[in-house]
Amino acid sequence: MRNGKLVVAQIGCGKFAEYQDLPNITSLEKLTLKWICDLDLERAGAMQKKFGAEKITADFKEICADPEVDLIKIATSHEIHLPIVECAAAAGKHIFCEKPMAMRDEEAWRIMKAVRKHGVKLCVDLNRRMSPALQALKKSVYDHLANPKHSPWRYIETLREPLPEEEYKHMIIRIQDESSSYGLQHVDPLIGGGEIIGESVHWLDVACWFFAPAVPVEITAWGSSRLSHGINLKFSNGDDMTLTFSCSGTFDYPKELFEVTAGNAFFRSEFFVENNAYGIPGAKSEYFPMKHYDGDIREEGFNAYIAKYHERFSNFTGNSKDLETAKPFEVDKGHLNMWKAFVEAILNDKPSPCDELAGFQSTYLAQLAIRSIESRQTLPVPVERYIPAIFIR
């Protein structure tokens, strides 16, 4: 701590660090950015100049050896999370790790053991659970189930007691992405692991967070483990989530859609900017402002987002990658909220908003999904694997 602030080090300073981590760190008054670490010292120096870090290094062990550092953010490629976590935990540093926490079960178990042995907090950046839109979606669903109301024109054939299956909640997550934006590192089996490990851990985590305390009991997956795929995840109380991930879509339309049916009502969250509920009298649309937008359209919501997107490209030609770095344009997926919650957890000794168990569970389910694709079989989710017993010497 320095002057009542947590001293932070950033390890890995690629595009995500430049446009998410470092702006978030420097925006929070309870944090002080001391170190930036990257194998490319020229890149680290550029980020130091842009964000005002005090020191740079190419060796993460130098950061772990600094007694002033309280918190380390890891934004490296997936395969080197484990050695950094083990070093940081042994040095008593709290750790904010980019998703996936690990690529394989043994790596995840070792991470769990390290942070628990040394008594440090770990947060995994499975940020969708912290987005304002999905927080509101979950609240709307469970508020309705606690006090259901229905339109007077609801179709009822015969009054009767509901059948057990009619009590189940069902979630559909639709992801349409554009694979021309992927580098080969994303699908390299040693570095990125493919889109189930690299991306779909987000939506597996959303389902587990949304339906808790129910736990997954069965998983079925199909397609390609490295690109387009589908996953169905069934829970102990009968609820289920079905994910469809297509990499043959376009950035010209929003990437993520979440839908839930529950209690004879339908709930939809459209790309973190608008939520709607149907079958509930008086239900109103909820709008969520974008995190970054500097155009002229003042309205909020899904249609306004589409208009803002087209406004952004109205006078632009060339590779949109160039515009991304020059003119930020971003919905609120929960990144900053996750930072705020984790800082609060450290300062006030509260539970992490997405701890090492949640990080492991998303990785474990992703590995099961890959095995389901390879075997073309539905697989069980044994509770002894989903909630492992980690012995600390």
Q: Where are these predicted regions, by residue range?
A:
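N-terminal Rossmann-like dinucleotide-binding module
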Residues: M1-F51
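Beta-loop-alpha module in the N-terminal Rossmann-like domain of NAD(P)-dependent dehydrogenases
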Residues: F51-A114
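Active-site beta-strand termini and strand-to-loop segments that position acidic
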Residues: I231-G238, V260-A262
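C-terminal capping/lid region of NAD(P)-dependent oxidoreductase domains
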Residues: N3, V120, E166-H170, R371-R393
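Hydrophobic residues in well-ordered beta-strands that form the structural core
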Residues: A17, F96-C97, L122-V124, S269
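C-terminal glycine/acidic-rich active-site capping loop/insertion
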Residues: N127, A262-C354, L379, E384, ...
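Predominantly a Rossmann-like dinucleotide-binding segment in NAD(P)-dependent oxidoreductases
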Residues: K15, R128-W222, R376
